[in-house]
Amino acid sequence: MLKNDLFLRALKRQSTPRTPIWVMRQAGRYLPEYRAVREKTDFLTLCKTPELACEVTIQPVDLMGVDAAIIFSDILVVNEAMGMDVQIIESKGIKLTPEIRSQADIDKLIDPDVEEKLGYVFDAIRLTKKELNDRVPLIGFSGAAWTLFTYAVEGGGSKNYANAKKMMYREPQMAHQLLQKITTCISNYLIKQVEAGADAIQIFDSWASALSEDDYREFALPYIKQNVAAVKAAYPEVPVIVFAKDMNTILSDVADTGADAVGLGWNIDIAKARKELNDRVCLQGNMDPTVLYGTPEKIKSEAAKILKQFGQHTDCSGHVFNLGHGILPDVDPANLKCLVEFVKEESAKYH
């Protein structure tokens, strides 16, 4: 029995005495304790060593007092499981080989046994659940198919996604085939994370805003919908968050994926989002991560503004406080602690 289930209750739009808070990338470089672990190993080895992944997953729970933990991993483990070589090169970025550009390339990708290929993630989840000892829920996650597709086709990050879009526009059937192959792997991966002990799931579509609204509806949303449906078919009680970065103009479509919660970027007023979606999903967000460079007073005033904009809770509303994207690596940890403590205290008046 979880000692603190506020996060899960908020996702299900059940009443809570205050607004729960966690932040994306909360296990990361801004923490000296994380850097101490990271100095001893490279990033992917850290992801693949359950004891280390568990240690850094729990750090922000111990040090910052957040209301949920998120398993330490990377979205590109799915691409690697499908047969791509993934390298994360310090100061140079991400390189995936081979780039997936042809039918033959797609055919060579495997439909992996996720238990075999991604067992280290499930081991890390099991170990973390044990070590958390029911203090807070644990979030499992995956990248969305569109975002993983862009990495596969581009062979890394991209400024304009030219190769990914070339495939979309010239060979749409091929693009859909690759997206479907990735989606099947994601669904299996998410279900196994829940089986290992994840209490909730987040799907990150980091490069969502590279697409127009219509293209997002065609090449991204149907696959997210499949992932949500797969998790819900196996585990109807497990809440799913969809974070489609900066797709503020089609929030209603994102909510229609069947997700319990929609993650918001910082460039939308949360009051507008709540009004548009009319409390049919929980909202997660949405402070600009750079606010954490500010003074404690500024951090508190910005957090207070978001809580006030969301407004008074009803018996069917839900809000999880978060940033609009990941915490930046050079933020002072004391500033995040200030935010967490303030949100816990200030939010009670709206419940």
From Swiss-Prot:
Q: What highest taxon heads this organism's lineage?
A: Bacteria
Entry's Gene Ontology molecular function annotations: uroporphyrinogen decarboxylase activity
Gene3D superfamilies reported for this sequence: 3.20.20.210
UniProt subcellular location: Cytoplasm
Named in its record, the pathway it takes part in is:
Porphyrin-containing compound metabolism; protoporphyrin-IX biosynthesis; coproporphyrinogen-III from 5-aminolevulinate: step 4/4
**InterPro entries in UniProt:** UROD/MetE-like_sf, Uroporphyrinogen_deCO2ase_HemE, Uroporphyrinogen_deCOase
EC numbers, comma separated: 4.1.1.37
Q: Write out the residues that bind substrate.
A: R25, Q26, A27, G28, R29, D74, Y151, S206, H325
Question: One GO biological process from the UniProt record?
Answer: protoporphyrinogen IX biosynthetic process
The keyword Cytoplasm appears for this protein: yes
Its quaternary organisation is: Homodimer.
User: Its family?
Assistant: Belongs to the uroporphyrinogen decarboxylase family.
The protein's name is Uroporphyrinogen decarboxylase
Q: Give the source species.
A: Chlorobaculum parvum (strain DSM 263 / NCIMB 8327)
Instruction: Tell me the gene name.
Output: hemE
